[in-house]
Amino acid sequence: MNKRAIAGALLLGLSVLLLASCGSVSTLETKAVTQTTASEATAAEEQPYEQYRNATEKIKKPEEQQAEELKKVLQQLNPQYGKADELDFWWVTSPRCIENEAAGKSCIAPMLGILAPSADPVLFIAFNYIGGEYMDMDTVEIHTDEYKYTYSSGTFSMEVQKDKVTFQNSPDKMEETALRLATDDDIDMLVDILKSDEVLLRFEKFNTAKPIWEECTMPEEDKQAIADVLNAYYLYLNASEMARAKAIS
């Protein structure tokens, strides 16, 4: 990913969020699926994002516990510090997303923008296409077990960024990244991905008389990356300012 461009887009998104609320502009279609008659019970412990999303009232924890839990999650994600236009910030994504890029895999890369303990975190989604040549993509489709989500270029937070991925023993590949400021509907989409057995990603160039597209199965590592970033997002969102300060200091 073009880190300088992504960092600039994060700053732009953070500024936009301060000026106005962002509505959902994605499209959602129900797919025809066979209903299952029984659900499998799971003994797995709820992850932080599940606890906070499903909570009917605010979860109260001691400040030190908030700071400790948040710091632990952020350290796993290796936050990057940046500064531009006299505004400093942290941007956070999963190492699994970086590993996918290094392996030449197209993927979804969720990330956080953090300005200061006094400001809530901002969630972004990067759609990352990697191929033999540039596509000039303008549309991304995500197919889960039950739904299809479509994002066109008008819903992106910036122009699609182009970069190159180099390999030691194989030809270079071209990379295109579209970044989107996530809405509540997008968070629902990410959770839907986590619940799906298989997810298909389709990167498209449709604003042309000669459309082209590439599709692939979403890397399994993306699911853990999504869960990790959602955990950090909800832990930060629900922490006190002092707990946030201790976690990022």
Regions found by a protein language model. Give the residues of each.
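Bacterial N-terminal signal peptides that target proteins for export
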Residues: 1-10
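C-terminal motif of bacterial Sec signal peptides marking the signal peptidase cleavage site
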Residues: 18-21
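A generic "folded-domain core" signal
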Residues: 23-249
